[in-house]
Amino acid sequence: MPTSRRALAGGALSMHVAYFLAISCLGYGLLGVLKVREPGAAPRRIDRFFTAVSAATVSSMSTVEMEVFSNGQLVVLTVLMLLGGEVFVSLVGLASKWSKLRSDAMDRSRRVESHGDVALADIDGGDVENPTSSGEEAASRRRPMDADTLRHNAVRALFYIVLAIFAVVHVVGAVAVAAYVLASPGARRTLGDKSLNTWTFAVFTTVSTFSNCGFMPTNENMVVFKRDAPLQLLLVPQVLAGNTLFAPLLAACVWAAAAATRREELVEMAREGGRAAAAGYAHLMPARRCWMLAATVAAFVAVLMALVCGMEWGGALQGMSPWEKVVNALFLAVNARHTGESTVDLSILAPAILVLFVLMMYLPPYTTWFPFEENSTTKDSNAENQGIRLLESTLLSQLSYLTIFVIAICITERRKLKEDPLNFSVLSIVVEVVSAYGNVGFSMGYSCSRQINPDHLCTDKWTGFVGRWSDSGKLILIFVMFFGRLKKFSMKGGKAWKLS
C-alpha cells in the first residue's frame, strides 16, 4: 500500500509539473507570435519565457514593463493566469476525479450485471434452499455500492459548487471593476492615458486578483490607483476569496447547499470530517478549522495594517486622506498573502515592514492557529503512510531550499552586489526570492538614483528587481517560481533533521 500511495503522489507531482510547463511554453510561444505595442520594445526571449512562467505560476514577477504588451498579449496573460490559478487547478482535479469515479461505477455496474446473470442461472437450476442467505449476500454487495455512489455524488456536487464560485466571482468582479472605472472620471482618465480598454482592464484585473497572481496591465501596478479607495475595496474580497479564505467560503457554500436541498452527499460534506466523502479535496475543511483559519487571517491582516499605519502614516502613505491611508494599508496587508498587488513603492517602506512581509509571503495560505487535537479524519497517521513520511522527512525543509536559492542568486549577481550595494542588497534579494517562492510578486524594484557610481545611461523602469539580474539569475528565479507553485508536494520535508 505505501508503494502504491508513493506512486500516486509521484504521479500527481509529474502531472502538475507537465501541466505548468506546458501552459508556460504555450504562453511563451503565443507571446512571441503576437506583436507588441511598439515594435522596437519587444522583450528578449528569456524575458518572454520569464513572463509566461510568472503568469502561469501566478507569481507576477516581472522583467519587462506591462504596457509593452499589446491587447492580444494581455489576453494571453489573462488565460495563463486563469489556467494557473489554484482554484482552477483544483477544479480540473475534481473533474478528473469525477470522471474516474464515474468510470469505476460503470465497471462495477457491468460486473454486478454479469453476477446477476450467473445468479439467475443458479436459481433456474433449483438452488433456492436458503433465500435469506442469498438476500444477505445481495445486501452486502449493495452496501459498498452505496458508499461509492455517495462519494461519486459528493465529488460531482463539489465540482459544481466550486465551478459556481469560480464563475460568479469572475463575472461579478469584472462587472464591478468595469462599473467603477466607467463611473470614476479619474480612473477612466488613467486608462485613457495608457490606451487601455476598460473591459480588458476589468477582466485582466479580476482574473489576476482572484487567481492571486498580482499582474496589472499598467506599468505601475496599483500605484496609479492609490487614491481610488473604492477600487481597492472591490479587489480585497477577490484576493481573499481566491486564496486564504477560499476554504471558509467553500464550506459556507456547501453548508448553504446542504441546508437548501438536504441531499445526502451535501449533508455528508457539511458534517465534520466531510473531506472523506469528497475524496480528500484539500480545500474542504471542517467548520472549526475554517473558523480558526478566518480568525488567523484577520489577525495577520490586523497586525500588518497596524504596522504599516504606525510606521508609514507620514511616510509612504503621505499625501492621502486618513480614509485612503487606512484602505491602502488594508490593501497592502491583504496582498502580502499572496497576491502582490501594491499601491506604494515597497523600496521606501521601513525595513521592519519588509521583514514582516517576507514572513507573510513565506507562510502557506492556510496557515492556522489551531490549538486542538486533530481527529482521525484529518490527521494523516495511518501505518500505511509511514513509508511516505519517511521519504518526505529525508528531504530538506522549505527554509533550507530558500537559503540555497538566495546563495545561488548572490553568486550569480556577486559583481553587482559589490558595485551597486544599495540596489543589490541581500534584503532585496531575499524579498525577491521569497516573493517568487510564495508566488506573491512583491519586489523592491531598482532605482538609478541609488547607484553609488551613477550610470548616465541608466533609466528607471517599472519592472521588478529581477529585471536587472543576469540571465543566470533569471533562470534560477524561474525555477523558484515553479518550485513555489508546487511546494505543496514538499511541505513536510526536513523532519529528519534534528536541531537539538
From Swiss-Prot:
Probable cation transporter. May be involved in regulation of potassium-sodium homeostasis. Residues 121-145 are annotated as: Disordered. The chain crosses the membrane at residues 13-33, 74-94, 157-177, 239-259, 291-311, 346-366, 391-411, 464-484. Its main location: membrane. It comes from the Eukaryota. GO terms for molecular function: monoatomic cation transmembrane transporter activity. It is a multi-pass membrane protein. It comes from Oryza sativa subsp. japonica (Rice). Belongs to the TrkH potassium transport family. HKT (TC 2.A.38.3) subfamily. This is Probable cation transporter HKT1;4.
